Design a protein with these regions (language model features):
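Long, contiguous binding/interaction regions
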Residues: 1-80
């Protein structure tokens, strides 16, 4: 069965994020006040798996082995 997976990778709290800071400052130059800005990478994958749980397990392996550095990143997985 085919499952659609959405994986969102963000930096863990406390990690420096120069990209987010640059965007936040640019937003301030536009006249808007922001308290916080988070950047993320999002991946949409279609996987073949026996069931939803297997699809999620496969997505976890993809995150841990390829997409995310567990020292600095956290990830969220949605399976449809």
């Amino acid at each position: 069965m085919k499952y659609d997976i959405i994986i969102t990778i963000t930096l863990k709290e406390g990690m420096l994020n120069p990209e987010a800071e640059a965007i936040r400052h640019a937003i301030a130059h536009l006249g808007y006040v922001t308290d916080r800005l988070v950047t993320a990478d999002q991946f949409r994958i279609t996987l073949d798996a026996d069931d939803k749980q297997k699809a999620e397990e496969m997505a976890v392996q993809i995150c841990e082995r390829l997409l995310a550095n567990p020292v600095i990143h956290k990830y969220e997985i949605e399976v449809f």
